Amino acid sequence: MLTTLLPLLPLLLPGWALCSQEASDGPWDLHMTQVSYFRNPSQVWHRGNATLGGVLTHVLEGPGRNVSIQQLQPLQEPDSWALTKIYLNRYLEEFVGLVQVVHQERGVTFPLIIRCFLGCELPPEGSEARVFFEVAVNGSSFVNFQPKTASWVAEPHAPSRVVTYTVDQLNKYNRTRYELREFLQDTCVQYIQKHITTNNLKGSQTGRSYTSLVLGVLVGCFIVTGVAVGIFLCTGGRRRC
């Protein structure tokens, strides 16, 4: 169930993480972030949003099982959006359950904040697109993805056996390396080229819808989180993974 629902996570980003909520003349971009604050194993507050070309498209905020989820752009029909919200809430329940299991197994120290920030930016014609996936734990940079080598690396200031173990695990699987790079460099960039540059964000869209893209192509991306979140949580504990 967790793997099935992970693709929905990119719809969630913290409001304070936005640089702008209006379209600009700068690089086109698709930015996604997810933040979960755990006061203790049973109390969590989720915040999130997504922006496309600087336009806020989705927001989420709330505690535990009482999360408010809103679609700010008419990207899904009411029936479809209602189903998406069900999946999102179900995912959040699974996410909290996972943290509780890891706490039981590893003795995690609370409070705990996990933040993932990823996306792609399309600069003026002729320049290479910028893609990124960054993970922070308790406000400190933890690991990031290097698309040129399709590999994860530890942040320079965070050397530890836990971080080393995490990087080793993430670099073991094609899904967390090459499939992620394909999403960031190809699917994400192509989506921006196809939809934002043709001014399709608020109008009718050709090809696959925004929702189909988000729920489909981010599977590989957020399976990364599924594989790694338990490892990330260990950084808040006193035991070695």
Swiss-Prot record:
Residues making up the signal peptide according to the UniProt record: 1-17
GO terms, molecular function: signaling receptor activity
Protein name: Endothelial protein C receptor
Stretches of the chain found on the membrane's Extracellular side: 18-212
Disulfide bonds: 120-188, 221-234
Expression by tissue: Expressed in endothelial cells.
Gene symbol of the encoding locus: PROCR
Pfam families, A to Z: MHC_I_3 (PF16497)
Glycosylation sites: 49, 66, 138, 174
Membrane topology annotation: Single-pass type I membrane protein
SUPFAM superfamilies referenced in this protein's UniProt entry, alphabetically: MHC antigen-recognition domain (SSF54452)
Keyword Nuclease: no
GO biological process terms, semicolon-separated: blood coagulation; negative regulation of coagulation
Organism: Bos taurus
